UniProtKB/Swiss-Prot annotation:
Homodimer and heterodimers. One of its GO terms (cellular component) is plasma membrane. Belongs to the Casparian strip membrane proteins (CASP) family. It is found in: Cell membrane. Residues 1-25 are annotated as: Disordered. Residues 1-37, 91-105, 174-178 are cytoplasmic. Its main location: membrane. InterPro entries: CASP_dom, CASPL-5. The chain crosses the membrane at residues 38-58, 70-90, 106-126, 153-173. Residues 59-69, 127-152 are extracellular. It comes from Oryza sativa subsp. japonica (Rice). The lineage of its organism: Eukaryota, Viridiplantae, Streptophyta, Embryophyta, Tracheophyta. This is CASP-like protein 5A1. Keywords: Cell membrane, Membrane, Transmembrane, Transmembrane helix. It is a multi-pass membrane protein.
């Protein structure tokens, strides 16, 4: 057997420094777009605005409930509005009291929530764009439907997803590297 048996030699530790001089711990990098920053608040407000416009435009038509993908877009836009608005309020609070929101649990919660809402918003926008192309180009039924409203709502849903993607990627990267 060639197992090694290391000997442990005690090393005298230096005296602890003054508690006032100790670093407060390792903080994650303060990147624009992270929770609790002005960039993060801007992204949340853009997500909310685009999702609210998509919801308002789609709800203004009277025939959206007849197509399942449009109902899915409305449901995803409602969820996106609620999520983005609540996190925008949290960001405003963090900015006002100068509080750091980048602890591990908060970033994990933000990343998971952003991932779920991003997947729902993107899939709803893709499904709605497929139906819109079917109605407009393939069936030529735009004279009977609200194609411009459907296209506008779908475009706003994609813009909401584009505003959500940096938030998700920054939170996920921060969660994975922390």
């Amino acid at each position: 057997m060639f197992a090694s048996r290391p000997a442990v030699h005690p090393v005298e530790a230096p005296p602890p420094p003054d508690p006032a001089e100790q670093p407060r711990g390792v903080l994650m990098k303060d990147l624009p777009g992270m929770p609790g920053t002005a960039g993060g608040l801007g992204l949340r407000l853009a997500q909310f605005a685009f999702a609210a416009v998509a919801l308002a435009v789609m709800a203004s038509t009277n025939d959206f409930p007849s197509v399942t993908s449009f109902c899915f877009l409305v449901a995803a836009a409602i969820l996106q509005c609620l999520w983005s608005f609540s996190l925008a309020i949290v960001d405003i609070y963090a900015l006002l009291v100068k509080r750091c929101l980048r602890n591990r649990r908060a970033v994990c919660l933000f990343a998971i929530g952003d991932g779920i809402t991003a997947a729902l918003t993107f899939s709803a926008a893709c499904a709605s764009s497929g139906i819109t192309v079917l109605i407009d180009n393939d069936l030529d039924l735009c004279s009977e439907n609200h194609c411009a409203s459907f296209e506008s709502a779908t475009a706003m849903a994609f813009l909401s997803w584009f505003a959500l993607s940096p938030s998700f990627l920054l939170n996920f990267w921060s969660m994975a590297s922390g």
